[in-house]
Amino acid sequence: MAEALAVESCSRCNFPSVIHQAYSGQHLCGRHLFASIRKRTSKELRQQLRLPKDARHEDGSPYRILVAISGGKDSAVLLTMMHDIIGNRRDVELISGCIDEGIDGYRAPSLECARQLAESLDVRFETLSYEEMGYERMDEVVTRIPVIGENHDEAKGLMPCSYCGVFRRQGLNALARKVNADVMALGHNLDDMAQSILMNLQRGEIDRSVRLAPHTEDPIDGVAPRIVPLRWIPEQEIHAHAICQGLPMYHGDCPHAPGAMRQQSRGIVADMESITPGARHGLLHSLDEIRRLHREANQDSKSEVNNCLECGEITSREVCQACTMKQWLTETS
C-alpha cells in the first residue's frame, strides 16, 4: 500500500501548508497566506494611493477606483483584496471593469467569471468591447497580421499580443473616463513585473521600465493613474490563495498568446527564481532604484506628451499607436 505523502506544516501554526515561499523559507497555510498577501497589498495601497481620511471630491462624490478585471486569478484576488481593505470606506467607490477583446471561446467564459465575482461582492461591473471602441475583434485582427507585416516595416514581427495590448490600454482609458475614475488598479503580480523588466532590458528600452505602473507619483493630465497593489505578490501565491478562497476564475489561456515574447520571458524568470530564490524581488527592487535615480535626475523636466491627431488620446507621437494599427487594419479590409 502506497504511503501517504507528507505535507509540511505551516511555519506559523500547525495546519498543513498550501505554499512554500522559497525566497523566505516559510511554509504557509491558507489562512496565513491570506494574511501575508493582505499585509503586502495593504502596504502598497497606502504607498501608491495615499488617500486622505476623507477622499470625497468637493461636490461630495466619492473617490472612484476602477479595478480592471479579466476573469483570471490575478484580477480576482486584486478585487477581493481591495474590497476587503478599503471596500467599507464611504468616501471611496470601487468599480470593476472588463475589456472584451472579441476572442471566441476565451473571453465569454472569463467575462462570466468576472461578472460573478463582482456581483458576489456587490461591486458595480462595467464592460467595453473592441467593437464599441471602433476596433476589429481580435480574432479578425489575427488573420490580417501577416499581410500588415508585409506592407509596413514598423509592423514586421509584431505578434497578436502587440496589437491587443495597445487596444486594451486604450479601452481601459476609455472605461476609466466612462466611470469617472480617479485611479485605475491593475492586477500585475511580481512575475508580471519581473517579466516586463526583463523584456525591456532585452530590447534596450529602460525608459519603458521607468514608465511602468504605479503612476501616482508621476500623473499625466487626462489619464487615470495606474496602481499595481499586487506587484510584490508572486503568481504562485496568488493562484494558491484564489483556489483556497474558491474565487470564480477562468483557467484557460488566450489562444493567440503562444509565441509572444512574454511567454519566453516567463520561462526565463521562472528559471532564475528556481536557481536564485528572490530573483524576481531583486529585479523589481532594481527598477524602483532606477526609477528613483531617474526622478532625481529629471526633477526640472516634464515628459513630453501630445494628444493624438486622430483620437485625442495621450501619446508621445503625433498619431498614437492604436490609431496607427487601426489604419493598418483598414488598409487590409
Would you name each region that the model predicts?
Residues M1-V67, I95, R208-S333:
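ATP/NTP-dependent adenylation/nucleotidyl-transfer catalytic domains that generate, transfer
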Residues A2-R211, E235-C244, C320:
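ATP-dependent adenylation/nucleotidyltransferase module used to activate substrates
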